[in-house]
Amino acid sequence: MASPDFDVDAFLQQPLTARIATSGPTVRPVWFLWEEGAFWTLTGPWARLFDRVKDDPSVALVVDECDLVTGRVRQVIARGRAELVPFDVVRGRRKLVRYLGVDEALWDARFVHYLHDDPGERGTMWLRLVPASLTATDLSYSVAP
């Protein structure tokens, strides 16, 4: 990957929404965690994403922002083969806190269940994408006063 004009790790630490594409093509928005050089997102047998990745693990994922007020437009595009790996609560908590805040009492019950239900019974898994390619681009522009 060529060196982008912005800090990719800092960009990916923000609670942005990514979009992940599977064969078909099918694209869906996902919340993610960027850790250990990988994108982590929750899935399970209740989601079409789970079956699509089992059938064909080739995916593409984009995280971007477009701020019309400031002219900041940045994107990170990852491609590779996704893996379905066992869910762990500690990482799950980090991911959900990133989007919902630290106070679980304020969370919608469906998110609390990810942390307190048995992942084996529920079927909760991580989709982990270690990018085979990662492209970061800054397309920002100057805004006229």
Which residue ranges define each predicted feature?
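Short beta-strand segments
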Residues: P15-P45, L61-E65
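A generic structural signal for short beta-strands and their flanking turns/coil linkers
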Residues: Q14-L16, R28, E35, D55-V59, ...
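Helix-adjacent hinge/juxtasegments
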Residues: L49-E83
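Short, solvent-exposed aromatic-acidic interface loops
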Residues: G44-R48, Y99-L100
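Extreme N-terminal tail/first-helix region
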Residues: M1-A18, R72
